Amino acid sequence: MSKSTAEIRQAFLDFFHSKGHQVVASSSLVPDNDPTLLFTNAGMNQFKDVFLGLDNRFYRRATTSQRCVRAGGKHNDLENVGYTARHHTFFEMLGNFSFGDYFKHDAIRFAWELLTGEHWFNLPKEKLWVTVYATDDEAYNIWASEVGIPAERIIRIGDNKGSAYASDNFWQMGDTGPCGPCSEIFYDHGEHIWGGPPGSPEEDGDRYIEIWNLVFMQFNRQADGTLLPLPKPSVDTGMGLERIAAVLQHVNSNYDIDLFKTLIAAAAEATGASDPDSKSLRVIADHIRSCVFLVSDGVVPSNEGRGYVLRRIIRRAIRHGNMLGASDTFFYKLVAPLIDVMGSAASQLQPQQAMVEQVLRAEEEQFARTLERGLTLLDDELAKLTGDTLDGETAFRLYDTYGFSLDLTADVCRERNLRVDEAGFERAMEAQRKRARESSGFGADYNSLLRVDETTRFFGYEHLEHQGRVTALFRDGQLVGVIRQGEEAVVVLDETPFYGESGGQVGDRGVLKAASGVFEVADTQKYGKAFGHQGKLSYGELKLGAQVTAQVDSARRERIRLNHSATHLLHAALRQVLGDHVGQKGSLVNDHYLRFDFSHNEAMKPEQIRRVEEIVNEQIRCNLPIQTDIMALEDARNKGAMALFGEKYEAQVRVLSMGDFSTELCGGTHASRTGDIGLFRIIAESGTAAGIRRIEAVTGEEALASLHQQSDLVQHIAQLVKGDSQTLVDKVRALQERSRQLEKDLQQLKNQQAAQESASLGRNVRDINGVKVLVRQLDSAEPKMLRTMVDDLKNQLGSAVIILATVAEGKVSLIAGVTKDLTDRVKAGDIVGHLAQQVGGKGGGRPDLAQAGGSDIAALPAALASVDAMLAAKL
C-alpha cells in the first residue's frame, strides 16, 4: 500500500532527523527577511541570511517542509494551474540544508539512501536518472563510482544561455554572492508516456520528471564574474512534495495524488460538478490551498501587493466554480476538508479555521455581486470581436469596474482560443496611475529609499543617554559629510539608546548633542542593521565622525513602555475570552494610546470587551514582574512563547514574561512590573478587514483622563435633562417615549392633512378621452406624503390616472398612480419615465404605481404640462 502525502512528508523529515538535522518549522508565506520577495517560494528563503553569513543558527544541519506560493512576481504559475499536471500556486518544498557542514558526498549519499532505501521510499534504482553541471567532475564521480549509477543515466548539462555559468545546473542567488553547481534527480515514469531524458530534444515531455535538486554552494561570485571558493561550502536541496507523492503513489499527474483527489471530490460536492476530471475542479482544489495558508499567514484580500494576488486567486477559483454551475457561495466550504487532508502541516490552521472561512466567504460574496455583470460585458465584447485579440481598454474596464484581474479575463479568452492585448491593458493601467499621482500632490519619501550599510548597536534597554559617533549623514536621501542649521537629515550612529520603530512600537524622539551643534530627533527608524535618527539640526553644524551625546525623551519613552506592556496583557486576555484562534495581526504602540489588530471573525460583544478590560486590570493590580530572558528560538517556542506574524527572529531571542499570564517574543521596551501601567481602558473596537478586528486602548494617565472625560459627559447630559447620574437613564427613557408619542401625533396630523388635500385635489380632475386625469404640483407636501395621497385619490376617484409632484431639499419628487382597470392602456412606470427624463432623473415601479426623482427643478412645470399630450396618445 502506497504512502499518503502526509506520511511522505513525515518520512522525509524523520529521515533527515535521523541524520542529525534540526527539523525547522516552515516559515510564513510572507518573507520576513527579504523585501525583494512577494511570497516565500523556496525552502532556502528562510535561511538566506545564514548562507550569506549574516545570521548564525545553533545548528549546522536543517530539514524543512516549506510552504511556498508562486503567483505574482517573477515566479508566477497562475495561468498554467489546472491545465498542466504539475503547476500549482501553492506547493510544499521538502529540503535538507548544510551550513558549512557536509557537502557533495553526504548530500548525494543521503538523497540516494532516502530514495532507494528499503525502509524509506524504496524506488527502483533503474528508474532514476541524474544531471550534473558540465564541469562538475566531483559530483559526476560520486554518482558514478560511489553510488553506482551507469554512465548513460548521468547527464552533463552545460551553459545554455550564451554566457558562462548560465545553466539549468548552475544555481546563483544573484549577480553576485553564493553560487554553485547543482545535481538534479529525475524519475522515469516509463515508455508509455512521451518524453526524453534531460538535455534531449524531448526533455519537455512528461516521462522524465525532476523530483529533487541538490545545490552545492561552493563559490562566491564577484562583480567582475570571477568565482572565488567559499571558505565553508554549503548545501541547499529542494524536492516538491506533490511530485514525489505522484511517484510513490504510481500516478503521473500531481492532481491524481490522494491529497488532490480528496480536495477535488470536496470541490465537486460544493459546486455540484459531476465530472471529476474537470480542469475547473483542479483549479479550485489548487487555489484553496494557497488561499487558506495565505490568509492564515496574515494576508487579507486587497487591491495592492500580496493582498491583490490573494484576491486574484480567490476570484479565479470563484469564476471556475461559476463555470461548474455553483449557484451559491462554495469556496469557504473547502477549508475544513483541506485541514483534514493536510495532516500535521495544518496545525496552524485549526485554531484559525473560522477566521479563514469568514475571510474567504466575505470575498466570495463581494465578488459575486459583480461577477455576473462583468461576464455579461465580456461575453458581449467577445461576441463583437472581429479578430482574435480583446483590446486592452476593455480588459482594463473589466478590472477597474468589475474587479476582473487581467489573468481572469485572459482565462476566459483562452477558453475561446482568444488572447488579450496585455500591452494595451498596461497602458490603460499606467494612465490611471499617472492620474492618481497628479491628483495626490505628494512627492517622493526619500527616507524610505535609504540604503544604509552601517551597523548600530542598541543600548536603549539599559540607558536613555549614551555616547555615539556619527557614521553616516543623509540629506534628501543622499550621503553628505556635514549638515547645517535648519537642515533636515537622517543621522546614523555607531551606538544609540534610541529605539528604532519595529514590532509596532514607534521610534524614540529626543536630541543628539555635539560640541558643534544640536540635532532634534523627531523619529527613529531602522535601515537594515542601522538606526536612522530623523530630524532637524536646530543649532550649529554636525559632521561625519562627530561624537554626540544621544538623549532619549524619557517621559515619552515611559508612556510608550506602559502601552507596549499593556498590549501583551491584552493579547493574553483576548485569547482567554475569545479563544486560542486569536493571533496578533498588527499593532501600533505610541505615547498616547495602543492599537491592536487580531484575528477574530465577528464583532466583540459588550460583555466580552468588559471582561477583557477586567482581566487586564486584574493583572495590573497583581503587579507581576516583567522579566526578559535571552534564549534560543527553539527553546522559546518550547516554553510556549508566542511568536508574532511578520517578525524576523534571530537564533537568540528576547522572551518577555509577565508572571505565568503572558509569554511572548518581543524586542520592544517595557515596564518593570505590570503595576506600573496603572490603569487600562478600551476606547474602541472595530473591524479592519474580513476576519480582522481592532482594539484601541489607553493606559495610565491617558486612561484616567478618558474616565474623567466620560464622567464630565455624563454630568453634562444629566444637567440637560434636569437630573443626576443616578436618574439619567430613567430621564432619557422618558424623553425617548415622549419623542415617540410626538412622532405618532405628528404622523396623524400629516395623514389628516393629506386626506384633506386629497379631497380638495379631487375637484381638479380633468377628462382625457373619457379617463379622469389629475396632474398637480404640491408646494407644501413632503415626498413621503405623496404615496398616501395617491392611494386616497384612487379610492376617491374609482378609475383615474394620478400624477403628483413636489420639491423638497432641492430635489424633485414625482409619483404616478394608475387604477388597475387602466394599466393595460397606460402604465405608471412609463409616465414617471417620461417625466424623469425631463427633470434630469430616473425612476420606476409597478404598472399601477411608480416613483421618480430629479434635480432640474426649473424643468418641472413644463414636464407636467407635457403629460396631457402623452396620455392623449395612449388613452
UniProtKB/Swiss-Prot annotation:
Catalytic activity: tRNA(Ala) + L-alanine + ATP = L-alanyl-tRNA(Ala) + AMP + diphosphate
Alphabetical list of InterPro entries matching this protein: aa-tRNA-synth_II/BPL/LPL, Ala-tRNA-lgiase_IIc, Ala-tRNA-ligase_IIc_anticod-bd, Ala-tRNA-synth_IIc_core, Ala-tRNA-synth_IIc_N, Ala-tRNA_ligase, Ala_tRNA_ligase_euk/bac, DHHA1_dom
Locations listed in the record: Cytoplasm
Positions annotated to bind Zn(2+): H564, H568, C666, H670
Tagged with keyword Acyltransferase: no
SUPFAM superfamilies: Class II aaRS and biotin synthetases, Putative anticodon-binding domain of alanyl-tRNA synthetase (AlaRS), ThrRS/AlaRS common domain, Translation proteins
Names of required cofactors: Zn(2+)
Gene Ontology terms for molecular function: alanine-tRNA ligase activity; aminoacyl-tRNA deacylase activity; ATP binding; tRNA binding; zinc ion binding
One Pfam family cited in the UniProt record for this chain: DHHA1
Role this protein plays: Catalyzes the attachment of alanine to tRNA(Ala) in a two-step reaction: alanine is first activated by ATP to form Ala-AMP and then transferred to the acceptor end of tRNA(Ala). Also edits incorrectly charged Ser-tRNA(Ala) and Gly-tRNA(Ala) via its editing domain.
Similarity-based family: Belongs to the class-II aminoacyl-tRNA synthetase family.
Annotated protein name in UniProt: Alanine--tRNA ligase
